[in-house]
């Protein structure tokens, strides 16, 4: 039976300790004030991938490594097929089941929970793919940039427009992310 843990804690990757830590880190980001609402709005408006933001912030804020625009583009290409063929359809199905469930169809509650579990597990898989891809990349000193610029680059890649997000909003979200308290076991 699938674990239906609402937080995603049940989907840890035992064979990859860093991926497990990145997943927990992402759960912590999600709880920061305004991060969830902003990320969901960006997801709806621009096709923004929250797992990709978690990856960018993990690389920049936790690993303290730089990621350049070309690397952002290559990383996005690495997972775009997975995102489009697995994550997005799972998300669409979950949203549909939730909407149907809200119309007094309690038998869909279990279906909704299963679809949410599939979506979370698929997002975890994407994070693992991104982390493994990053580990395989040659790191070039001086090539990278800060988190704000990496997120801007990603937004311009997925939305085909570099200035869709208000600068203040971007700075605020990236500032929250950059200052998250990390667990001592990293």
Locations of regions flagged by a protein language model:
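Aromatic-anchored, charged helix-turn/loop surface patch used as a conserved interaction hotspot
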Residues: 2-12, 69-134
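Acidic, glycine/proline-rich low-complexity segments that act as flexible tails and inter-domain linkers
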Residues: 2-4, 8, 26, 33, ...
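Short terminal or interdomain "cap/linker" segment that borders an active site or interface and mediates
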Residues: 11-24, 171, 178
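Charged, terminal alpha-helix-loop-beta segments
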Residues: 20-22, 46, 159, 174
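Short amphipathic alpha-helical segments and their helix-coil junctions
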Residues: 22-44, 110
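Conserved active-site and cofactor/substrate-binding residues in soluble primary-metabolism enzymes
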Residues: 30, 50, 125
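N-terminal interaction modules that seed assembly of large macromolecular complexes
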Residues: 35-80
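A charged, amphipathic interaction segment
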Residues: 97-177
């Amino acid at each position: 039976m699938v674990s239906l843990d609402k937080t995603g804690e049940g989907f840890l990757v035992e064979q990859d300790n860093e991926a497990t830590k990145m997943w927990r880190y992402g759960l912590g980001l999600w709880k920061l004030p305004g991060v969830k609402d902003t990320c969901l709005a960006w997801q709806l408006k621009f096709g923004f991938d929250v797992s990709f933001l978690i990856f960018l912030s993990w690389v920049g804020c936790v690993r303290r490594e730089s990621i350049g625009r070309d690397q952002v583009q290559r990383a996005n290409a690495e997972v775009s097929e997975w995102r489009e063929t697995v994550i997005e359809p799972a998300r669409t199905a979950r949203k549909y089941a939730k909407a149907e469930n809200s119309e007094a169809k309690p038998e869909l509650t279990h279906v909704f929970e299963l679809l949410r579990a599939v979506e979370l597990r698929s997002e975890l898989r994407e994070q693992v793919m991104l982390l493994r891809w990053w580990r395989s990349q040659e790191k070039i000193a001086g090539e990278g940039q800060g988190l704000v610029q990496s997120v801007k680059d990603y937004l311009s890649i997925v939305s085909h427009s570099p200035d869709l997000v208000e600068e203040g909003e971007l700075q605020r979200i990236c500032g929250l992310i950059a200052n998250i308290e990390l667990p001592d076991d990293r």
